[in-house]
């Protein structure tokens, strides 16, 4: 059975030759070179992923939603009752939440995964529960390093198993009351930003309670002293089971050479951890939308990512990842279905990148 160290070691590098061939093919399509903008660069990125065999393609699609509760909820950093995590996880199994509707529209299957819900097991939810909620990061670590490593490996294996069964495009999502607080702590640590710069309203936290949330994040970092150069240390000390789970999806998909669509702010924090743990993961990450959460800009700048959609969304759940799946499919359709200039009577001046 593969260890976490072996999984990280075996993440493949991008196929530079395949990317060059893809760029050459795209430049020869029936359009001015570069005129489809980022759709072209996305197709080239996909072509470099070894799991897609040198060509942009999408077969089965899956959104993996990591569900967990957080001890830091006790600090008054969220307005929703903790039980909402379990209620919404159950609603996901019925297909009635935002991510389920958007995923169905995109033709993707939603996998609802319990990595730490503080409730009785829920029928229809995949059980990878580490504990009933993680520790309160304002007073100590979220979990042990061993727990974080074990969950990373378990989720990575689950992701790779889905890849073996035909999934070629993954989306990540989360569900957990108070989870924007550990996400803000992680972004603060990885980017070196003060908590005031990254803490937002989450699920409609009143402005009068923001200062408390900022203070909680600062205390969590001061008490736990996470090492920003050690992604697993940050996850285990100021993260949460859902954030570890999303990081595991990214590591597992990268190990299989396959793309992962990020969601919003929570997924950005997990992406920062994944890229710190294994920098090669970066090639496989596709930013879906620009989260409306306050710290989004800082996190995305640190990741050097520019999301494809600006929708003022902050639902989470993987909703943005599901919404962006058709964009990935459009890049593949462009690559495979457009005609070629060489077969037409059109001759474009060299360097012309403007649409006619």
UniProtKB/Swiss-Prot annotation:
Signal peptide start-end: none
Catalytic site positions: 317 (proton acceptor)
Keyword Transferase: yes
Entry superkingdom: Bacteria
Stretches of the chain forming a coiled coil according to its record: none
Gene3D superfamilies given in the database record: 1.10.1610.10, 3.40.50.10210
CDD domains linked: DMB-PRT_CobT (cd02439)
A single GO BP: cobalamin biosynthetic process
Any GO molecular function: nicotinate-nucleotide-dimethylbenzimidazole phosphoribosyltransferase activity
A Pfam family assignment: DBI_PRT
Pathway annotation from the record: Nucleoside biosynthesis; alpha-ribazole biosynthesis; alpha-ribazole from 5,6-dimethylbenzimidazole: step 1/2
Enzyme Commission (EC) number: 2.4.2.21
Catalytic activity: 5,6-dimethylbenzimidazole + nicotinate beta-D-ribonucleotide = alpha-ribazole 5'-phosphate + nicotinate + H(+)
Keywords attached to this entry: Cobalamin biosynthesis, Glycosyltransferase, Transferase
Alphabetized HAMAP family for the sequence: CobT
Binding partners and assembly: Homodimer.
Job of this protein: Catalyzes the synthesis of alpha-ribazole-5'-phosphate from nicotinate mononucleotide (NAMN) and 5,6-dimethylbenzimidazole (DMB).
Family of the protein in this entry: Belongs to the CobT family.
Protein name from the UniProt record: Nicotinate-nucleotide--dimethylbenzimidazole phosphoribosyltransferase
Native source organism of the sequence: Salmonella gallinarum (strain 287/91 / NCTC 13346)
Gene transcribed to yield this protein: cobT
